[in-house]
């Protein structure tokens, strides 16, 4: 089908090439043979009067013209999918929808397991593809490659709608047999004990406690670096090390690992886990249904107001006379990516 001289099928080809950045993978994703894909690329180049892609090894590198086309083409295809192809009504009991959700393993364990159980009852054919957090999460949302992003709200972009899910705070965890971990941890003890620290690939956004230390020119003693909060408890077992973890996750691991929870000697701000979705999914019935379930289940974990008040009370009662501890209360939120 042509529209003002453009074969509209070529827009699907262009979108697949921008996503896969590989000719063979793009052809496979839209069920075209490689010769047919090569012919489609030639037609795209002829229509737009631009190379669109150059080869670097086996990777397709888009030209500035291709980059400028990527977003409007993707938006047009998504609008067609959501407004024309998709049915007006969404029936959860009959739907076979698969939701692609980017989230941490921490949130998967403490929150999303309940979502899976709920959906299995209400919509048995609905499925999920849970993906790790990536640095380009904003781009994934923009292109509609994920349906939802769940992560701490301060790290989210302002380019997409979002909703708060539940409040969380960081605590210090250690093995129950750790004799060097007192019931009231001082700042000096915190800095001197060997730590298991989390460092994600999101290099431009340091963790909350890391940001505090960086702001004050401080460096803690790190024995082991892991890529996930869930890897901290095994590294603490039978050792004198400590680790900083979300309270709910420590409570989860406490059932199977001998852990002890101690308040941090830092007045770190509590944070909110939030859900974000592409703006063009705002009116999508399936997305609305899923958002309602996320919000309903998150409400069972306690309101953000209650969590914030609990944290404020706890921190104020545990503040030390150390001026660094007092300054930590002035810690700014991490910058949005």
Swiss-Prot record:
The keyword Zinc-finger does not apply. The keyword Repressor applies. Keywords: Activator, DNA-binding, Nodulation, Repressor, Transcription, Transcription regulation. SUPFAM superfamilies: Periplasmic binding protein-like II, Winged helix' DNA-binding domain. InterPro entries: LysR-type_TF (IPR050389), LysR_subst-bd (IPR005119), NodD_PBP2 (IPR037416), Tscrpt_reg_HTH_LysR (IPR000847), WH-like_DNA-bd_sf (IPR036388), WH_DNA-bd_sf (IPR036390). One of its GO terms (molecular function) is DNA-binding transcription factor activity. Residues 6-63 form the HTH lysR-type domain. Residues 23-42 bind DNA. Belongs to the LysR transcriptional regulatory family. There are at least two nodD genes in B.sp strain NC92. NodD regulates the expression of the nodABCFE genes which encode other nodulation proteins. NodD is also a negative regulator of its own expression. Binds flavonoids as inducers. This is Nodulation protein D 2. It comes from Bradyrhizobium sp. (strain NC92).
């Amino acid at each position: 089908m042509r529209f003002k001289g453009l074969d509209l099928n070529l827009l699907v080809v262009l979108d697949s090439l921008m996503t896969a950045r590989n000719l063979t993978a793009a052809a496979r994703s839209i069920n075209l043979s490689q010769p047919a894909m090569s012919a489609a690329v030639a037609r795209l180049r002829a229509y737009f009067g631009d190379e669109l892609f150059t080869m670097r090894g086996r990777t397709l590198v888009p030209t500035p013209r291709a980059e400028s086309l990527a977003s409007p083409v993707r938006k047009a295809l998504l609008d067609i999918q959501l407004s024309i192809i998709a049915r007006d009504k969404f029936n959860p009991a009959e739907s076979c929808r698969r939701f692609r959700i980017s989230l941490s393993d921490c949130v998967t364990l403490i929150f999303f397991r309940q979502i899976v159980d709920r959906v299995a009852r209400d919509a048995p054919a609905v499925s999920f593809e849970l993906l790790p957090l990536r640095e380009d999460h904003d781009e994934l949302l923009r292109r509609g490659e994920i349906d939802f992003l769940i992560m701490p709200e301060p790290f989210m972009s302002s380019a997409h709608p979002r909703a708060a899910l539940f409040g969380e705070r960081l605590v210090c965890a250690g093995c129950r047999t750790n004799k060097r971990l007192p019931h009231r941890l001082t700042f000096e003890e915190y800095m001197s004990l060997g730590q298991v620290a989390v460092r994600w690939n999101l290099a431009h956004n340091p963790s909350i406690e890391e940001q505090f230390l960086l702001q004050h020119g401080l460096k803690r003693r790190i024995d082991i670096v892991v890529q996930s909060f869930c890897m901290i408890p095994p590294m603490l077992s039978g050792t004198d090390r400590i680790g900083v973890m979300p309270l709910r996750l420590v409570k989860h691991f406490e059932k199977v690992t001998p852990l002890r929870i101690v308040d941090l000697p830092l007045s770190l701000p509590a944070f909110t886990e939030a859900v974000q979705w592409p703006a063009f999914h705002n009116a999508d019935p399936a997305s609305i249904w899923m958002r309602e379930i996320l919000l309903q289940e998150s409400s069972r974990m306690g309101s953000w107001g209650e969590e914030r008040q609990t944290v404020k009370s706890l921190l104020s009662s545990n503040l030390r006379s150390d001026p660094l501890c007092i300054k930590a209360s002035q810690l700014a939120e991490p910058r949005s990516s």
